[in-house]
Regions:
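Positively charged n-region of N-terminal signal peptides that target proteins for export
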Residues: 1-5
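Long, low-hydrophobicity ectodomains and other hydrophilic envelope-associated domains
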Residues: 200, 204-275
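C-terminal motif of bacterial Sec signal peptides marking the signal peptidase cleavage site
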Residues: 16-19
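Tryptophan-paired
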Residues: 58-109, 253-275
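Short beta-strand edge segments in extracellular beta-sheet folds
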Residues: 119-127
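Bacterial signal peptide processing site
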Residues: 21-23
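Compositionally biased low-complexity segments at domain edges in trafficked proteins
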Residues: 130-232
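Short acidic/polar inter-strand loop motif in beta-rich domains
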Residues: 108-117
Length: 275
């Protein structure tokens, strides 16, 4: 009887040890996940629909590696945060790379007929904010699954302003709205050799490009460039949106988007809303 009791006690102790070991490994794994420093992402460019821009070059620094990814797309104008193209994907052998840490971009604002450059190393606070966004999964109710942000969007605005977004399936979030580039001189021949050959001057080149954006030119003639426009756009309010349906039995399903003037959007991440 004593022998049986000893065996039971030893077996019980081994079970506790194994369980604790497994819990420790799980906790360690989850902690490491929360400290991920390599992510799968791509760098993108965008601008407001009414203010089309053209990129000369754009590079995004990768973590503390000293490396960068270069944006291949030149033309923008689909909307705030609406990326028009993709990049030379720069993942390492493990399928990921460090989070964005800097931006060096030169672009042409057609309506202003000016070149701007933003060359900035992100603050540690901004780098950490971007890393946290890449680490955090968000739930997509219609798809019933989690997604991660996989896009880093450089959005150019008039007068050299730049907003930065993280972008994913069904969601886009503004992470920085305080960056401002400086006006620079770029010879048209260096920017676009064919454009220089046929247009000769920057004014003529921009006027030619704007033929593809007639609505933007019309808007510019009516409204010009408002100094306070983007400050108004980025102001956020703590709205609680309520829907009232004519049909009291109507139900608003989860498969719809919230879209904001900032260019942010996301799927409703909750259960269906009854009227």
């Amino acid at each position: 009887m004593k022998y049986i009791l000893i065996v039971i006690m030893v077996s019980f102790a081994m079970c506790i040890s194994t369980a604790c070991s497994g819990l420790g490994n799980k906790t360690k794994k989850e902690d490491n996940k929360g400290m991920d420093t390599a992510f799968c992402w791509e760098a993108l460019v965008a601008s407001s629909r009414n203010y089309p821009m053209e990129v000369h070059y754009a590079r995004v620094g990768v973590g503390n590696s000293g490396g960068y990814v270069g944006v291949m797309e030149r033309f923008t104008g689909s909307g705030l945060g609406e990326a028009d193209g993709t990049v030379d994907m720069g993942s390492d052998s493990n399928g990921g790379m460090g989070a964005p840490s800097s931006v060096d971009i030169v672009w042409l604002s057609y309506l202003e007929k000016k070149f701007y450059r933003l060359n900035v190393k992100f603050s540690l606070e901004l780098q950490d904010k971007i890393r946290q966004k890449f680490r955090t999964k968000y739930y997509d109710w219609p798809a019933k699954r989690y997604w991660a942000f996989t896009g880093f969007v450089i959005n150019m605005l008039p007068k050299g302003h730049v907003w930065l977004y993280v972008d994913g399936i069904g969601r886009r979030e503004l992470v920085c709205d305080t960056l401002v580039g400086r006006e620079v001189n770029v010879p048209l021949q260096d920017f676009d050799e064919d454009g220089y050959r046929y247009r000769k001057t920057l004014d003529a080149f921009c006027e030619g490009r704007l033929r593809d954006y007639t609505w933007a030119e019309e808007n510019f003639k009516r409204n010009g460039l408002s100094d306070g426009l983007w400050d108004t756009y980025k102001t956020k309010f703590n709205y609680e949106i309520e829907f009232k349906f004519e049909d009291e039995k109507a139900v608003l399903d989860v498969d719809y988007l919230y879209r904001f003037l900032t260019g942010e959007f996301w799927h409703r991440d909750n259960k269906p809303m009854p009227s």
